[in-house]
Amino acid sequence: MAVNLQEHAHKLEDALRNSEEYKAIKDAYDKVKAHEESKKLFDEFRETQLKFQQMQMQGEQIEEEDLKKAQEQAQAIEKDENIAELMAAEQQMSQVFQEINQIIVKPLDEVYAD
């Protein structure tokens, strides 16, 4: 009987949705959305991050003015308790993803380990 990897992936998705890490992100993001200033800061910061990622992917230089704006946004975010909680929760989930990724790529690592 063939192993259905997509089926296992869906089970992993369900497990992630039921994890404490996911629930912590969801709760923290709900708090950010409930506070207008937090939501505004968060949205602006994400927009800046996406802009920088697109520029890097296209090989464009990031302007000094844009870097300064991003630094100011980061400082404002660090002071926002709601966003700080969300970022901490995201960090925890990122750790989970790293651990899962190590497990997933282990078979390939073993193939090339000689």
Swiss-Prot record:
<dbReference type="InterPro" id="IPR023378">
    <property type="entry name" value="YheA/YmcA-like_dom_sf"/>
</dbReference>
<dbReference type="Pfam" id="PF06133">
    <property type="entry name" value="Com_YlbF"/>
</dbReference>
<comment type="similarity">
    <text>Belongs to the UPF0342 family.</text>
</comment>
<protein>
    <recommendedName>
        <fullName>UPF0342 protein Sca_1419</fullName>
    </recommendedName>
</protein>
<dbReference type="InterPro" id="IPR010368">
    <property type="entry name" value="Com_YlbF"/>
</dbReference>
